Amino acid sequence: MKTQTLLVTFLVVLLMVATQTEAGIADILKGLLGKRGLLDGLLGKRGLLFGKRGPLFGKRALTNQDFLDFAYDPSLSAADMDALEMLFEDY
């Protein structure tokens, strides 16, 4: 009997929270699944994982490794890094 009471109480509290934060949940889902949302940024045509500019699985994954080799060079200044980023962006 205690388990059933605890379960019903948990469901009631969960229902209360869900109805009070409906707009918040909708905003979170819109942020994740929307046109410019997080998932589109990761998996879309210009996403980070599989897109053209994707550093992990994109068409230019090997050239991005070259960029990482330069990025960890301690002798580069911030201006050098900006110029290098622009070169690799246009490459």
Swiss-Prot record:
Q: Which residues carry this modification: Leucine amide?
A: 33
Cell compartments where the protein resides = Secreted; Target cell membrane
Q: Where in this chain does the entry annotate a coiled-coil region? A: none
Q: What is its main location?
A: secreted
Q: Which UniProt keywords apply?
A: Amidation, Antimicrobial, Antiviral protein, Membrane, Secreted, Signal, Target cell membrane, Target membrane
Tissue/organ expression: Expressed by the venom gland.
* GO CC terms in record: extracellular region; membrane; other organism cell membrane
Position of the signal peptide: 1-23
Any single biological process term in GO: regulation of defense response to virus
Q: Which residues are the propeptide, according to the record? A: 37-91
What function does the entry list?
Antimicrobial peptide.
Q: Which family does it belong to?
A: Belongs to the non-disulfide-bridged peptide (NDBP) superfamily. Short antimicrobial peptide (group 4) family.
What extra comment accompanies this record?
Shows a low ability to inhibit hepatitis C virus (HCV) infection in Huh7.5.1 cells.
Protein name per the record: Peptide Ctry2146
**Protein's organism:** Chaerilus tryznai
Q: What is the lineage of its organism?
A: Eukaryota, Metazoa, Ecdysozoa, Arthropoda, Chelicerata
